A protein has these predicted regions:
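Canonical Rossmann dinucleotide-binding motif of NAD(H)/NADP(H)-dependent dehydrogenases/reductases
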Residues: 4-38
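Short, small/polar-rich loop/turn modules that mediate ligand/substrate recognition or access, typified
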Residues: 184, 189, 240-242
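Alpha-helical segment proximal to the catalytic Tyr-Lys
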Residues: 136, 155, 181-182, 238
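Active-site Tyr-X3-Lys motif and surrounding loop/helix of classical short-chain dehydrogenase/reductase
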Residues: 75-82, 101-110, 114-121
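Short C-terminal tail/terminal secondary-structure segment
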Residues: 230, 241-264
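A conserved structural motif in NAD(P)-dependent oxidoreductases
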Residues: 214-225, 236
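Active-site helix of classical SDR
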Residues: 131, 168, 176
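Catalytic Tyr-X3-Lys loop
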Residues: 88, 96, 109-128, 143, ...
Length: 264
């Protein structure tokens, strides 16, 4: 449903390459409520998403930047401010659960420093970099909404072989809480969302199977996560800050997480 709740607001979203991912879903959700957009990804596909959004009538500008390139991010932030005059909303959606190699799982004893640094960089440092690039402008204007995409994996549960990802996603929550206290009196809220099993274009067969064992019997959708982010980006959430909000279909509250017919 298109409304004007975010009309006059400008949002910057990271991780907007896949047509089936949470980043693009977030961009569409914010635009539906009237926001103008900046979208960023390391992939050239970000320009495809820009084209898609423009065809929907959205005011949008795309940036192809590595989120670990601090100078590139600062340049994008400066350009966004020049084009739109301000950035009110920052949604740090980008991240991934692998080491930059073909291996998906690797125990701590077998990790090398490069693999650890890759995961920490792409999940945690990227969030720090974009936040720092846009934060001063929000402080100067005494207004801002920052939403960080963490995960249930790390802050609340863990998997063997995923220690860098778990560490990074847990650290995002710590960053969220500390920053919320630093800038709360400047009318800036900072929150994190913790998705569980979400069906995206990057989901593996095992991840999709895991989604069938949630309390709701299905994985979530990028649109469902995007609507939560949109709520936190709106003034309806004006007194919510420093929080981690779980969106996982009731998965982590279960003691037993296998097929229901084997237990109930």
């Amino acid at each position: 449903m298109k409304t004007s709740i975010l009309e006059g607001k400008t949002a910057f979203i990271t991780g907007v390459a896949s047509p089936n991912g949470m980043g693009f879903a977030t961009a569409k959700a914010l635009a539906e409520w009237g926001a103008s957009l900046g979208i960023l990804d390391i992939s050239h596909r970000v320009f495809d998403r820009e084209k898609d959004l423009k065809e929907m009538g959205v005011a949008v500008k795309a940036y192809k930047v590595d989120l670990q390139d601090r100078a590139g991010i600062k340049a994008a932030a400066d350009d966004m401010t020049a084009v739109y005059g301000k950035v009110d909303i920052l949604a740090n959606v980008a991240g991934m659960a692998y080491f930059g190699t073909e291996e998906i799982f690797k125990n701590v004893a077998d990790l090398n420093e490069g693999e650890w640094d890759f995961s920490i960089g792409i999940n945690l440092k990227s969030t720090f970099n974009t936040t720092q690039a846009f934060l001063q402008g929000m402080i100067d204007r005494q207004y801002g909404k920052i939403i960080n995409v963490s995960s249930v994996t790390g802050p609340l549960v863990a998997n063997p072989g995923e220690s860098p990802y778990c560490a990074a996603k847990a650290a995002i929550v710590g960053l969220t809480r500390a920053l919320a206290l630093e800038v709360g009196k400047q009318n800036i809220t900072v929150n994190a969302v913790a998705p569980g099993w979400i069906k995206t274009g990057a989901s593996t067969e095992s991840e999709l199977a895991g989604g069938l064992n949630t309390g709701m019997g299905r994985p979530g959708t990028p649109d469902e996560v995007a609507r939560l982010i949109r709520f936190l980006a709106s003034d309806d959430s004006s007194y919510i800050t420093g929080q981690l909000i779980v969106i996982d279909g009731g998965n982590i509250i279960q003691e037993y997480k296998g097929p229901s017919e084997l237990y109930y």
